[in-house]
From Swiss-Prot:
Gene name of this polypeptide: fusA
Key words of the record: Cytoplasm, Elongation factor, GTP-binding, Nucleotide-binding, Protein biosynthesis
The protein's name in its UniProt record: Elongation factor G
Chain positions recorded as GTP binding sites: 17-24, 81-85, 135-138
One Pfam family here: EFG_III
NCBIfam families referenced in this protein's UniProt entry, alphabetically: EF-G (TIGR00484), PRK12740.1-5 (NF009381), small_GTP (TIGR00231)
Keyword Cell membrane recorded: no
UniProt-listed CDD domains: EF-G, EFG_III, EFG_mtEFG1_IV, EFG_mtEFG_C, EFG_mtEFG_II
InterPro entries (UniProt xref): EFG_II, EFG_III, EFG_III/V, EFG_IV, EFG_V, EFG_V-like, EFTu-like_2, G_TR_CS
Subcellular location: Cytoplasm
Length: 688
């Protein structure tokens, strides 16, 4: 069956922002104007179409990335609405990995906020072209100029308005288009009814100057346009749009729009800008992967190429079971076809193919290059896996997910719960790559780890509501880590004789710090001093010991282990002997005195009235906080600090008390850092 929409008329975009900037409301209005929904839902009322999870509706926030498809001016727009809370940043990251463009929503009063900076960095990492929508122009305190200024100050980007607001706060009533040099006045409460007007007299000179600023940015992009401008020739709207599009596609420039999604003002202009300035799959570079011999393979965005896709999300649907979301980069595939999971080297069957709208679905028979869809039947596929035609061996770059920083022990309340809890936790860990489950080797307790207190709260809530599992939990604990600080070469020799065949394994391993590169194993054995069939056992022994830690049972991270020598016995050597020998070698590093405890450091941003600065800073200092920056804004101050996570439990209550409930804060994981000696000794003592 031929595709309904040509690739050049397809857009794959995300909506991203800080929490409460209006992402989901913006998406709802887009769906309303494109005819996808006929009643507008509100996040604060708990009836948003895109926030379909019970936990989202209760909290008025987006937790997962919801996907939908809309149509505007003969174009198909695939939209992913992403979370704004820092605990769910990974949802944004994996969505950006498969998108071609994005709309960044900025609060007109707050400007660029902490999570805006985080998701902007993620989008820059993936080289995603973006347009910017300054939302909530009707809000008390809204300032378009201030919001635009924060784009330069906090993001350091090349952005310029292509629109100007007519009025602000309660007086926000229209938009000036700097390309057309005309105005739009909204009639009533939305942009359903509007009229085209001349630019108000008091704005004409200002608008003209802003248009000139816009044109003068393009001397590096279009010499002909600059020459026309310098020679006093008229610059056509089409010419300007084309140059803006080219610069936006390269992520060299970011057009700025304005409006109020809640009041339905300016939303149609966003849709026009998505089509005018954001890329189709054909505008994006060909996808690059490699084969098992590490040779580069390039796939063009075309239906005629071999099927190539990347899985980016897994979720459990109560009616159809496991759903795997994937982006098709090349080729086509039909329902019922077999594909290869090239990452895991297993064959999978696409039982059903679905076009999703939040949690509702439409069955489709075939998918094409550029599509974002969900499949039923992929049993072994997880986020980051490459799906290909049978016998194809291309593997796309996978996804990197941060390690969780907070954990709790969990146990089922009843025998019935015990039977269900393992399956439920396993399904939840498939959906959340930053949610981990492990067993404490000393206490035999099941430990669950996540990115923050809200993340844990959502997991526990879903256990109860979706999987009907009641569980007891203890207080959240910090997920400490261990690491090496200097190079050491140690020996592990395991010999056992007990009559008959014995056990013999002998290794010499050099251990060294591997800063921010994870754990790495290198085999430098030459001449067969250890037969190659025992090398995987050495690696396995190290992996298990690294995960169990040495000082206090916390996983060892950022360690490079190089196997440099050893010996074997023709009769007595075995895989288990070499596995134990490797573990013994790692444990010897404790005697070298170069192991340390690492603690997670959080980036904390507090917004407080001026009256309480002393209280807030004094409290942060008492929590081992390091002040990074202070930024005054009207009658408030924004304080940025780095604070160990262990000092932040219960902080919300203390902050309320210190500021009479008038301050707010947000925090996100930044890095692991060596714990002070007295703190480390206390941690080790508790664990041992």
């Amino acid at each position: 069956m031929p595709r309904k929409f040509p690739l050049e008329k397809t857009r794959n975009i995300g909506i991203m922002a800080h929490i409460d900037a209006g992402k989901t409301t913006t998406t709802e209005r887009i769906l309303f104007h494109t005819g996808k929904i006929h009643k507008i839902g509100e996040t604060h009322d708990g009836d948003s179409q895109m926030d379909w999870m019970k936990q989202e509706q209760e909290r008025g926030i987006t937790i997962t990335s919801a996907a939908t498809t809309a149509f505007w001016k003969e174009h198909r727009i695939n939209i992913i609405d992403t979370p704004g809370h820092v605990d769910f940043t990974v949802e944004v990251s994996r969505s950006l990995r498969v998108l071609d463009g994005a709309v960044a929503v900025i609060d007109a009063k707050a400007g660029v906020e902490p999570q805006t900076e985080t998701v902007w960095r993620q989008a820059t990492e993936y080289k995603v072209p973006r347009i910017i929508f300054v939302n909530k122009m009707d809000k008390i305190g809204a300032s378009f100029d201030y919001a635009v200024k924060t784009l330069y100050q906090r993001l350091g980007i090349n952005a310029s308005p292509i629109q100007l607001p007519i009025g602000s706060e309660n007086e926000f009533k229209g938009i000036v288009d700097l390309l057309e040099m005309t105005g739009v006045e909204f009639l009533g409460t939305s942009d359903e009814k509007f009229k085209t007007i001349e630019i108000p007299e008091y704005m004409k000179e200002f608008a003209q100057n802003k248009r000139i600023e816009l044109i003068e940015k393009w001397h590096n992009y279009d010499e002909e346009l600059m020459m026309d401008y310098l020679n006093g020739k008229e610059i056509t709207v089409e010419k300007l749009k084309n140059v803006i599009r080219q610069a936006t596609l390269k992520a060299d420039f970011f057009p700025v729009l304005c409006g109020s999604a809640f009041k339905n003002k300016g939303v149609k202009k966003i849709l026009d800008a998505i089509i005018d300035y954001l890329p189709s799959p054909m505008d994006v570079s060909s996808i690059v992967g490699c084969n098992f011999e590490n040779k580069e393979i390039i796939r063009k965005t075309s239906d005629n190429e071999p099927f190539t896709a990347l899985a980016f999300k897994v979720m459990t649907d109560p009616y159809v079971g496991k759903l795997t979301f994937f982006r098709v980069y090349a080729g086509t595939i039909k329902t019922g076809s077999y594909v290869t999971n090239a990452t895991k080297q297993v064959k999978e069957r696409l039982g059903r193919l679905l076009q999703m709208h939040a949690n509702s679905r439409e069955e489709i028979k075939e998918v094409y290059a550029g599509d974002i869809v969900a499949a039923v039947g992929l049993k072994n596929t997880t986020p980051g896996d490459t799906l290909t035609s049978i016998n194809d061996d291309i593997i796309l770059e996978s996804m990197n997910f941060p390690e969780p920083v907070i954990e709790i022990a969990i146990e089922p309340k009843t025998k019935a719960d015990q039977d269900k809890i393992g399956i439920a936790l396993s399904k939840l860990s498939e959906e959340h790559p930053t949610f981990k489950i492990y067993t404490n080797r000393e206490t035999a307790q099941t430990i669950i780890a996540a990115m923050g207190e809200l993340h844990l709260e959502i997991i526990l809530d879903r256990l109860k509501t979706e999987f009907k599992v009641e569980a007891n939990v203890n207080q959240p604990q910090v997920a400490y880590r261990e690491t090496l600080t200097k190079i050491s070469t140690t020996e592990g020799k395991f010999i056992r004789q007990s009559g008959g065949r014995g056990q013999y394994g002998h290794v010499i391993i050099r251990f060294e710090p591997n800063s921010d590169k994870g754990n790495e194993f290198i085999n430098k054995i030459v001449g067969g001093v250890i037969p190659k069939e025992y090398i995987p056992a050495v690696k396995k022994g190290l992996e298990e010991s690294l995960s169990n830690g040495i000082l206090a049972g916390f996983p060892l991270i950022d360690v490079k282990a190089t196997l440099i020598d050893g010996s074997y016995h023709d009769v007595d050597s075995s895989e288990i002997a070499f596995k134990i020998a490797a573990s013994m070698a790692l444990k010897q590093t404790k005697n070298e005195g170069n192991l340390v405890i690492l603690e997670p450091i959080m980036e904390v941003e507090i917004i407080t009235p001026n009256d309480y600065i002393g209280n807030v800073i004094g409290d942060l200092t008492s929590r081992r906080g390091k002040l990074e920056n202070q930024d005054s804004r009207e009658n408030t101050v924004i304080i940025k600090a780095l604070v160990p996570l262990s000092e932040m439990f219960g902080y919300a209550t203390i902050l309320r008390s210190n500021t009479q409930g008038r301050a707010s804060f947000i925090m996100q994981f930044l890095k692991y850092e060596r714990a002070p000696k007295n703190i480390a000794e206390e941690i080790i003592k508790k664990r041992n």
